A protein has these predicted regions:
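Anionic-ligand binding patches
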Residues: 2-5, 11-192
């Protein structure tokens, strides 16, 4: 059975990835489940650079482990870009306001910063770059987006991160109000993994 290691410690992201990749028939492991204890510094200037850095660094470690020598390592870098805020928080989405700051606080801060801004200027997108480091040492990266606007309040229990403020006008709800199945169907990650 093919093994795919997804370079993340984010449990919510692993749930989403396992659902998206469930039809592959591969064993999907998180970095932790594979026993890889590495904290890769994502110091790239773009989502694509950060995804490639993470995938290649984790692949170097995995290739030293006999059970993962032929594993594919996937890594993503993703975040929220808000046009009115000059694409903030961007590549710093996870570290915005500090890594220990809860998303409830991050989301409320973004809503406060956009107070009084009309919907047509609240355009935003989730961006995801996924890199695949192959056993032969090659690495490919693709980028996808999911367009929306920043809503006016926190809404929804599904999803994680910025989902409760990311409003999808065509569905009349936030990403966090979508069912997990619908969210995965629309996901910026899903669109990339099937490329």
């Amino acid at each position: 059975m093919e093994k795919i290691i997804f370079a993340t410690g984010n449990e919510h992201k692993m749930i989403e990835i396992r659902a998206i990749l469930s039809d592959l028939g591969a064993e999907i492991l998180s970095q932790k489940e594979a026993g890889i204890k590495a904290d890769v510094v994502e110091d790239g200037a773009t989502f694509e650079e950060n995804a490639m850095i993470k995938a290649t660094e984790i692949a170097k470690i995995a290739n030293q482990m006999p059970e993962y020598k032929n594993a594919v390592v996937l890594a993503d870098d993703s975040g929220l870009e808000i046009d009115y805020l000059n694409k903030e928080p961007g590549i710093y989405s996870a570290r915005y306001m500090g890594e220990d700051t809860s998303y409830d606080i991050k989301n409320q801060t973004l809503l406060d910063r956009l107070e009084g801004v009309p919907d047509e200027k609240r355009t935003a997108r989730f961006v995801c770059a996924i890199a695949a480091a192959m056993p032969d040492g090659s690495c490919e990266v693709v980028r996808g987006t999911m367009e929306g606007i920043i809503g006016h309040e926190i809404a929804g229990e599904n999803g994680f991160g910025y989902d409760p403020i990311f409003f999808l006008p065509e569905y009349g709800c936030t990403s966090a109000e979508l069912s997990p199945e619908k969210k995965n169907e629309l996901s910026h990650r899903l669109s990339l993994i099937h490329i």
